[in-house]
Every structure is written in structure tokens, then in C-alpha cells.
Amino acid sequence: MTSEASGAAPDGADESSVDNYSRKRRVFVREVAGAYSEIYRQLGERPRVFSERDVAFKGGPQHFVKGVINPGRDAGTQLFECHIDVYVPGGHGQRHAHMNSAVFYILEGEGYDIHDGRHHDWKAGDVCIVEPGCVHQHFNASAHEPARMLVIKSKPLFIFAGLMHQRTVVPEPTNPVPGWEDFDPTAVGTDSRREAQSR
């Protein structure tokens, strides 16, 4: 068993640098078994529309995530997943790399990514692509506004094929951005937030 599979620190990393990636329980592939006609019928009965409001945010204090579509939600797909990410003003996420590609559609805010040491600016309406194996990190460049993005990954397909290596280079920050200790990611992108700003 590798150190990552056991939850221990990978070679060359201390115990404090290991995030919860290797410890978090996931559904990688749902069982597909039975008569073809029955499986096909069940597929047609699965939901086609999902509300992000039905899923709670996880993470923090600088980066929050909610998994909207993935194999574990019985969404009728096992090839990709999508989640909503929110970054606190001035916040950032972990620096990491994975074998699957990923697409980030910026819904709100502005910031930048570092991909293999190169700086890439982004803003609402942009699409950012991370290629397989790229060491990357996301940053919210605004000190006053949160950043929100829709992330689409082919991770379930890669995991099914055994291409599941992921490495955290720098873990998620554990301290909140000063002044944003009580940040509520559920208010981002909602009418209540816009109303509060207009007061």
C-alpha cells in the first residue's frame, strides 16, 4: 500500500502538508448491472436538472466547494463531475496537480492562476483550462469581491482508467483572510448579496 493510499504523508512531505484528498470518501464508479432494457429505463428516469442550492459548501476558510454533479449523486454520468468554487476576497486555494484536465468558467469576480509557474489573469465570463499534470493554483485578485467559478473535470473517467495520481504541493490555507473571518459562501451570486451591496 502506498503512503497516499494509507493516508500517510507522501514521500518528501511532512504530515501537516497532507490534505484530505486521500482520506475523503468518494463514489468513483457506480455499479451498472442488470438487464440492458432496465438499465436504459433507469437512465431515462434520472434527474436532468440539479440545483446548486441542494448541496452544502465544504472547505474554507479561503476556498469553498460544493459538488453539484458527480457519480455519487446518481446524475446519469460517470465520465465527469462539476462543482462550484468560491474564493474569499484575497483568498486562494491549494497548489496541486492531477492527471485529469479541468475547465473553469468564471461566473463572478476576477483573479489569476499560476500554471507551472506562469501567470494567467481571468475575470467573469472567461474560461480557464488546466491541462493534465499542470501544477496550478487559483487566486482571487480582489480585496473586496469574492470570485465564483463552475469547474468541470473529467476526473471520474481518469480514476476509472486508473489514472488517479494527484499531488498537493502546497495545501489549502488554514487561516482566514483578515477581515473575512465570517465569510458566507452561500451569499455569493445571490440577490441578497446584491441587495446588501446596494445599501
List the predicted regions and their residue ranges:
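A short, N-terminal "cap"/entry segment at the start of jelly-roll beta-barrel domains
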Residues: 2-78, 165-199
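Conserved short histidine dyad/triad with adjacent acidic residue
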Residues: 65-70, 81-97
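A short hydrophobic beta-strand segment most commonly corresponding to one strand
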Residues: 82, 103-105, 128-130, 144-163
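Glycine- and acidic-residue-biased ligand/ion/polar-headgroup-sensing regions
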Residues: 88-89, 100-111, 117
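Short beta-strand His + acidic residue motifs that chelate non-heme Fe in jelly-roll/DSBH
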Residues: 93-96, 113-114, 130, 136-143, ...
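A generic "binding-loop/recognition-motif" signal
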Residues: 99, 118, 134-135, 155
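Short acidic-glycine-tyrosine-enriched beta hairpin
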Residues: 117-133
